[in-house]
Every structure is written in structure tokens, then in C-alpha cells.
Amino acid sequence: MEHRYNVFNDTPRGNHWMGSSVSGSPRPSYSSRPNVNTTRRFQYSDDEPAEKIRPLRSRSFKSTESNISDEKSRISERDSKDRYINGDKKVDIYSLPLISTDVLEISKQRTFAVILFLIIQCYKIYDLVILKSGLPLSGLLFKNYRFNFISKYFIIDSFFLYVLPSFNIPRLTFKPWVVYLQILAMLLLNIFISSDHEFVLISLIMTTWRKLYTKELSVTGSAINHHRIFDSSAHFKGALTIKILPENTAMFNPLHESYCLPMDTNLFKINSIDVPIRINSTEEIEYIELEYRDLYTNSVELRSLSKKDFKIIDNPKSFLKKDQSVLKSHSNDFEEGSTIRYLAVTLQDIGFYQIKKIVDSKKLNLKIHQSHLVVPYCPIASITGTGSNDRCIGDSDNVSFEIQGVPPMKLAYSKIVNGQTFSYVDSSLQPEYFESPLQSSKSKQSFTQGELNDLKWGRNQPVNINLDSSITQDGKFAYKIDKITDGLGNVVDFTSLPEELKKRYDLSYNFNVHEVPRAALEERFDPKSPTKRSIAIVFEEIKNWISDIPYVISLSYTDAQDKSKKIMNVTTDSLTKVLQADLPGSYNLEYIESKFCPGEIVGKSNVLVTMPVAPTMEVKSFPILDQCVGQVGLNFELSFTGAPPYYYNTKIYKLENGERKLYDAKRYTSEGTRNRFSYSPPKEGNYEIVFDTVSNKLFTEPIKLEPVKEYTFKTSMRVKPSASLKLHHDLKLCLGDHSSVPVALKGQGPFTLTYDIIETFSSKRKTFEIKEIKTNEYVIKTPVFTTGGDYILSLVSIKDSTGCVVGLSQPDAKIQVRRDIPSAAFNFFEPIKEAKIKHGSVTEIPLKLSGEGPFTVKFKHMDYDGNIVKEFENKFQNSYKPALKVSKEGLYQLVDIRDSSCQGNVIYRNSLYKVSFLEKPKFAIQDNHHITKVTENLFSKEEVCQGMEGTVDLALFGSPPFILEYDLMAPNGHISTKKIQVATKYASLKLPNQIPGEYITTIKAIFDGNYGESDIHFREHQSELIIKQTVHPIPDVAFADGGKTLRACAANVDQISFLEPINLKFLQGESPFSITFSVYHESTSRTDQYTIDNIDSENFSFEKLYEGMKLGNHAITIDSVVDANGCVNSLISGPRNQILVSITDAPKIHILDPSTEYCVGDYVAYQLNGVAPFMIKYEFNGIPLKSKERSSQFVRLASEPGIISITSLQDSSSQCIVDFTNPKLKSEFDDLSLNIHPIPSVTVSQGNYVTEDIREGDQAEVIFSFEGTPPFSLTYVRTEETDGKHGKRRSQVVETHKVTDIYSHEYKVITSLQGTYEAIEITDAYCFAKNDLFFNN
């Protein structure tokens, strides 16, 4: 062993052991590695005892060591040859290969290791093929072949991968964790490839194995490949190909366009259409016969077209209205030398068309490709509106669309409001309960005969869509029809038509919406008017008010005595209309209206005008006497009539020497009807005072006081009791009220006080005198004022106890008595005293208030039965646009009104207003027997089975179009939200059924033209409606021991205790079940069906399946299952769906099908009764043979014709041998003998493949020759070549013929159709052959 490590004695190439630490070496020495605690087999530590690491000894070592550094470059090259040189003085011997390189080089060691691994894997593949073939595979467990396979190769692979690192082969020595990963990977690979899944590579190997190595025992006793003994194609020889050039075909409307004829040719100047026909022929077309059916009478008419009735098309693209890509399939039609042409046929009538016949110039008929064409009237639509072209805010649009066309139709229309366009599309428009083949999602180019029997679905049907929503803004409104598409695909686009045509043919509908005018009545001063008053009607300025003029105003006038009433109607083109009040009386603003809309009176509506009186003045003079000096001046008492204040002028003259000189001139103002004016000359002398003119604010021009003499007074330079009013403001009284006025008195009482009360509007004066006033203060009680107007309380004089009477000129007290009583009423713009509002919205009820603000209005809210719900009190600062804001429905009644100073009256005829809610959109589930109402908001849909479609029909109430929003919760809890838009008042919700479980459909909200999705308040108050439907799973039942074979004896079939039980697994469904079983009897090839009811996990009368079983094998399968829910599953398949029952008896044998004639290639099958294995002896064509059968059948391949006879039979239980050669069993011997017949053959054209060309209309003869036993039955086909994938040509069967009862050995066929004629099946008196080569291709 020592010499083994002294390798330098034997080779001049240096160290060639693995593990050397040379530069360039791919593997470092273990001396340079870190110490790792692993098994020694993989890695060794430098801490091993020194004696285990021996120094290398060699005679040439020293010289070699000195040259190591020079040899590094050559050492690097030798690395590829697995030679390593170490400059160290000691080497880790445990890192060297286990097998010396002198014995086997490193590269070869690697090669052998890889070859060994591949051998293991090939053997694994061999066992895998056996496993996949279902053959026994030995291992740890006898029955579980897959476990045997996995355990076997887990041990082999693990052992190989675990031991491999021990050899220290470079590049094949792995770390322990890598080895464990390799073992795990191989284990997972073994589990994966041995599973039941199909893999392409394994399938290819299995298929190749079965094809190359599958052999079967024949009746001669030898193992023969079935495919080699019987070549079916050898019995079919020859074929005849007939060619007819060229092929003449025609196709109507090849581009599958849709056509229609306009009902009104004034709009579209079209009265005919040209439909193309695609012709594949070199000859000219002479005659075309069209079948025409009237859409309304279904009457059929054949129309003959000659050359003059159609024309040739150079460019078929001109007929294409839709996508040009459809011409790609006809791209070869336009190549040079093509025989394809296009003709155009002119059609002028609506109806159904198809080509019946086309004849060319040689009087030959062209082949017609079926294509139907329905030409209806083009769809039309119109818009109508029931209202005026000029409408007001609050009116309804009242627009309806009338559509006529072939349903189902689609309408696209636009709504334009002040230039902003809103587009809408309504699809699937059709009458209720309408059925049509056009309702399918795919377009149809041909129709069934049942659909053509009644063409009413091709007629134009009317559909109406009504839009009714309230208008909330002013401006220009327009509805336009953009496009309409019928069910056949005809599209009529109106967008490019001029506006004039759209209006003429009701394709657009326009109207204007105007704002409501508002106005109030005002009283103004007018000096030019006889009454000095004018009436002004002031309108609010609104947008585009100029377009709404003229305004119409209705005024009523009532004279002052309330005796006559006059109505005045005036118009104005401005926002303010001023009228002179020529006559006194009451002026009332009755109503206003603009050019288009009735108006609202938002402020004061009544003005009372009186006739003013010209001011007059009465002057009385009293000397001012002084007890000492006598007269010192004059006191003037001035009495005025008219409306204060008054203005008067005085001139003072001084008399000197008989001359009168103007001494002074002054202008005075009197605020009351009485005034006291004193004049004391400043100097001694005689003076003359002249009152010249008087005026007031109504009569501004001064009025001369005449006669002058009465207004001229003289005085010379020649003090006293007094009284004054303690009132610092004017009194304001309501009509019918009275008041108190305090008076302060000065002087020596008792006093006598005289005062006047004057009506300024009539100049009437009433004097009152109060005597014996003993105090210095007194309160004057005014009378009750029954007439409204301005009054003046004026103090006239006072007399004290000395009897001195002093006239008073103190300021008067002004009393303003209201002429009117405040009133309140609802301001109705229309005769209807009702407003409709949306739920959750607020509306304003306009009020009409008269009086002086602010106002306090009380009203009450009542229900429709008159019961008071609540009372309210509102305050209004003025009478400009007063309105009550309400948000609840009911009756609102005015109760009381008070203005700033007076209690008012309510006008009861206009004191009641009704507010009701617009009808909320709602829906109702249509009653039928498929849905049940559980609670008010919960419905239960009839339970269905998985895969059955169901719908819920809803009736919708409100203003269309509707939007229905609902949630759909699947059984897995997933919730999806959906919305549908419906233009009619009926909707259907489709309920899914793909997954079993409970589906919950929650209808969350419905919106219509009044209540939209933006109405959050309405959305929050909608109650949800829930529809539940349970989808039951399809029942699934399988045999607990699927694929297992049960055994029973024929004698014990009727005794249940001796029968093996048949157990079921209930995988899915609701018990009890009703299951239909099929029992296939191999011996008779007969199948019996049994239906067993009330089956569950504890109750199954399986013994019924054994009834009627005779000797032999019986396959029991489950055909269908019906569970307690009524769900049916008839698609059960797989190995778990079948079990086998073998009924055995004492050794017996009989032919499985004694009535069958056996042929070469068939399987001769005998049924064996007894306990396997069986020993069978038989003869074939006189040659004695024997076989040991381990199954219950003796099956042999009939490899050649002859007679097979059974001579004896023995089983393994009784060891009884049945000798059928015994004369006593001659009848059984004859019954068990079979004659195997040869396969019949057929040849065409003497077995040659012949091509025969004939012209159109000529005929050819096809001769079939037979071999076999008559009578013969022949099946032959005619095939033609068509284009296949990737441009390859392939044959396609166009005709199949079967001829029976041929008693001769030859059969002839006369034909004029092109194609290849060949036989595919032949039957003689006994046997049948099929050309597998033909069917496989």
C-alpha cells in the first residue's frame, strides 16, 4: 500500500492525484479548506493523526520540486487530462480517487458512473411502461404496483447517489447537502412520473411499445401481431377519379350585406337596390330564376331574369357598405385569369329572396350556394311633441319617439340643451312577446324552413318610447334622431341630413323654454295727472327678457264708491309700465303674462288713489291788545284745505302820508291745516298785511288769493291763555281703530278747549268743544275711523276763567289711518292649486301679501284628511317674492296675517294649497308560479338545478327610461354590482346557475326620468328587495369499489346472503336518490336497465342488480342519478362508475356469440365457466392444440380461415375434464365448432388508380369487382379535394352510397359528378371489411 502513494517513482509527470493544490487547479486541497464537521467519506480534516498523512517519497522528487514553478504553464494544460501537480511536500490521501488512475483514468471513471446512472434510468423507464400498461410489478407491497415502483427506485437512486461521492471522482464528488437534494429530487421525479397524469414522452413510449411489441395468440397457437395478419387496405384496390372542368357555381349576396328599401322615397331618393351574385364560370349567364316571398302574405313567386335584367360588376367594393375586410376572403377573385365574376340584380320589392336556378350559355345549370336575403322596409323613426314650441319652466317636455323597423332595433338619439349635447342609445327595442330568429347574438345568412314558413318577423313593427320629465331650466331644447339599426343590420344614419329635412320629416324636435315673468304694482307722484298720482307696473329683469315681450298687464279699477269695476288690459315692451291715475279709486293688478308664459305677482298688487283738492286758505285776524298800550299787532288764524304742507306768501306795506310802500315780503310754511301767524310791527306806525298766494306739494304753482280785499289786513303798533299737543310723532292707526292725544294747558282754569278733526282727502272738518277742564293736562279721545286716509287734529282755541279766548296756532297732530286691511293668500299661477315635488326636495309656495312689512304669517300643515300635522309662523320683511318653503306633502292652509302695525285677513278662497310627491319609481315582481313572496321585501325563486337558466320578470312604474341597480351575491360570497337601462316598463333579470349554492339578488335602487342617480336623498330611502334562489348541485354517485370484479355462482344468484354487496359513494346531491343502472351481459351483448328508488347511505337494494344474471361476466354501470331535489345527472363516466360481476359454474364452455359468423381478423371467443385456470384442448384445421387459460374466457385471434373445434375442457377446482369427442357429446362438439371465413375484397378499375376527365353533362362508368361469397353489400364514396391548413390540399367526402343485395361479382355505377370514387366498406354473406387506410387519412 505504501507504493501506491509513492507515485513519483512510477511517472515523470508529477502528482496526478485529485486534491492537489496547484495554481490553476479547479479543486483546492483539503489542507487549505476550513474544518467542517461532516462524514469522513466526503471531507477530511487536517486534524487527523500525522501517521495517516504520509510524505510522498521519490528519487526524483527534489529535482522535480525545483522545476515546479517553471512547469506551471504546462501543468495548467495538463489539468484537462486530469493530471494535477502539487508543490506541497505532503498530500491529503483521503482526497484522492478511490480507484487509482493507473487502473482507470478520471475521465473514464466519470464516463462509467454516468453510464451506470443511465442504465438505472432506462430500467426505470422499462418498469414505468409495465406500470402504465397495468401489468404486475413486484416490490415491497404485492397489490400496490405504484408503491412498488416508487420504493424500488427510491432505494436504487439513493444508494447510487449516496455512494458516488465515496469514489472521489472529480466533478462527481458533491457536498452532503447537495447529495440529499439530489435524492429528494429523484424521489419527487419518481412520484411525479408514476402518477395517473398523462405525459407526452411517456405516452409516446407507451404507444411505440404497443405498436411494436404487442402480440396476441392466434388460433394456430402462435403469437402474432394483429396488425400484421390483417391489412384491411389490401382488400380495397383501385380508385377512379372523374374530373369536370370547370366547376360552375353561383352565390347570392356573397358579401353578406344587408339591404332595405325606403318606405318614403321623398327623403331617400332610392326605389331599388342592386344585389351582387358571385359567379364562378367561364360561360356567360343566360338566365336567372329568383324565388320571391312576400313578407305580409307569405305568397311565393318565381321571377325569371334574362341578360337585360342584370349587369356585370367591375368593382364589387362599391356594394360594400360595412367593413372592407370581408373582401379578404375573396382576394383571389380579382387575380388575373380568375373565372370569378360578379353580377348585379336589381330588386324593387321588399320580401325574401333566394336563387333557385342559374343557366349559362350552354344551357347548363350552375351549382347554387345557399344564401338567403331578406329585404324589408328601411327602419324609420320620428319625434313628436304634445306641447307648444314655446314652453315655460315647470312644464313637461312630453316627447315621444315612434320607431318602425324589423325588431330587435337600436335607436341612437341626442338631447341638446343650450348647445350642450347628451347622447343616448336604446337597444333591443321590440314589441312585447315578440319572437324572431334575429334575436340571437350572431348574424344569420340563411334561415331554416320553419323560420321561412311565416315571415312576419321580417316585417316592420312599431315601437314607441315616451319621455316625460319636468323642465327645470330655460333655453333652447332640441331632440334629434341620430341613427337607427334594425335586426337585419340595416343602418339609417340621419346625422348628415340638413336640418330642414330633419324638421320636415320629424327627425328633430325643437322647442324653447322661457322664464316666468314677475311684477309688482307701485304708486308714484305725477304732477301732470288729475289725481297727481300714477300707477307703475315694474317687472323683474330676467335673462333674454326682450324675446319675451310684449308683456300683457291686466288692471282692474274700482271707483271710490265701489259701484263700478273696469278691467284694463295693456301691453308694454319695457320692464316698467307707468299709467296715469286719471280717476280716484282702487287699482288692482289682476295678472300679468309675457309673450309665452303667465306671470307671477310678487309684490304689492293694490293701490288706492284719491282725487286731491286745490289748497285754499281762510284768514282771520285778531288785534293784539295790550292793556297798557292797546293794539300792538295782529294775530292771524290761518285755516287751510288740501294736503299739507302749505306754502303761502305775504306782503307787508307801510302806510305813510297816504302812500303804501312795500315794507317786507315773506314766504311761510304751514305743516298743518291751521296755522297761527302773528305780526307785530317792529316800529310804530300803520301797516297793511296782504296774503298773496297759497300752494302745497300737489299744487306747486302758487294760487292767487282772491278777492284781495278779504286777504288784506291793517294794524298799528298798538299776552294770554295757551294750549299745545304733547305728541311728538304722527299717529298711525288701522282701519276701524281710535287713539288718544294728550294736551298741555296753560292759564287760569277751568278751561274750555275747542279742536277740529279734518279729513284731508275730503276737506271735511268737525269741531269739538270740551268744557270744565280743571287740570293742566287733558287727553283727547278720537272717534273710531271707518274710512282710511290722512286726518289732522288741530287745536282751535282755549278760554280761561277770565273769559279771555285765545286762538291757538300750535302744531297739529297728524293721524294716518290705513286705507286697506292687510291680507294674505297663496299666489296661484295656474288654475291648479297643487304642486308636485320630488321626495327629499324643497319647494316654495308663493304668497301674495298686501300691507306694510314686515309680515307675520301663520299657517298649518294638514294631511289629506284635514288632520292638523303642525302649525307654523313665518316672518317676511316685505311683500317682494314671499314664499313658504315646504318639503312634505299634504295640505297647507293660511290661518292668520299681521303686518307691521295691523291685524289682517286671510283670503280663504286662495288659502289652501296642496303639495304632493312625484311618484317614486318602483318595480314589482310579476306573479307567477315560479316565485314565492316570503316577506314584504323577500322573495324566493323556485329552486333549480345546476345549469338551468332562470329569470325574474319585473314590472316597472314611473317615467322611463329606467335604471335598475342590483347586487348579485354568488355562493362563494363574491358580490358584483350591476346596472341595466330599460326604455320600456318591463325588465328581466337573468339569474346565474353555474355554481351550486344560494344566489342572493338584491335590487338596491331604481331610477327614472324624475328621480335620477344624483338624488342622494331618494337613494337613501329606497328599500332593498331581495330575491333568493337555491341552485342545487348535480347529483354524483359512484361505486365504492369502482373497477373491482365481484364473483358469484350461478346457483347463488337469488340468495342475497351469498352475494358480495355493491356499495355506493354519494359524492354530491341530496338523498334519497333514484339511480338507473345498466347491466351489460357479455355473453349476450345485451344491456338491461334497472331503476332503484329511495337510495341513501343506509338503504340500497343492490340484490336487484343480480337479477337475471346468467353465467358469464356482467358490467354494471351507473347511467343516471336523480336526487331528492329532482336534479338529474346523466353524464357520469370514469372507472369509478363501473364494476364487474363474474358468474361462474362447473367447467363449461360455450361460444360467446354462436349466431355470429367469424372472419379472419376476428376474435374467436369462448366463455368458460368454472374456477380458473382452465386447460383447453382444441383442433384447428385438424392440428391438435392446447391452452391454459387463467381467465374466464378463451379468446384467440382468427389469423387464417379454417375450422376450430373444442375437444376437451378442464378447470382447477373439480379437475373435471369434459371430452367433447365422446359421441355422446357430439351435439356439444358441433355447437363448439366454428368456421372462420375469409375476408371479402373489392377492386375498382381492375385495381388501378385511374383519372378520367369528362365534360360537364357527360357520364362515366365506375366498375366494382368483388371476391367472396355473395350476396355482397358495398359502400363507396365520392371525394373532392379542398383547401386544408397551411395551403395543403385534402380530400373531403361529398357523397356516400351504400348498395346491398349484389349477387354478382361485379357492380357498375353511371355518374356525371366529378370526384374520386373508391370503396370503403365491403360485406359478403359472412364477413365485413373496412378500408382503414381511408378512414385514418
UniProtKB/Swiss-Prot annotation:
GO terms for molecular function: protein-membrane adaptor activity; structural constituent of nuclear pore. It comes from the Eukaryota. It is found in: Nucleus, Nuclear pore complex; Nucleus membrane. GO terms for cellular component: cell periphery; mitochondrion; nuclear envelope; nuclear envelope lumen; nuclear membrane; nuclear periphery; nuclear pore; nuclear pore transmembrane ring. One of its GO terms (biological process) is protein import into nucleus. The N-terminus is blocked. Sequence repeats lie at residues 390-413, 626-650, 732-755, 836-859, 943-966, 1058-1077, 1157-1178, 1253-1276. Residues 1-48 are annotated as: Disordered. Residues 132-148, 194-1337 are perinuclear space. It is a multi-pass membrane protein. Residues 1-110, 170-172 are cytoplasmic. Residues 19-37 have a biased composition (Low complexity). Functions as a component of the nuclear pore complex (NPC). NPC components, collectively referred to as nucleoporins (NUPs), can play the role of both NPC structural components and of docking or interaction partners for transiently associated nuclear transport factors. POM152 is important for the de novo assembly of NPCs. This is Nucleoporin POM152. It comes from Saccharomyces cerevisiae (strain ATCC 204508 / S288c). The gene is POM152.
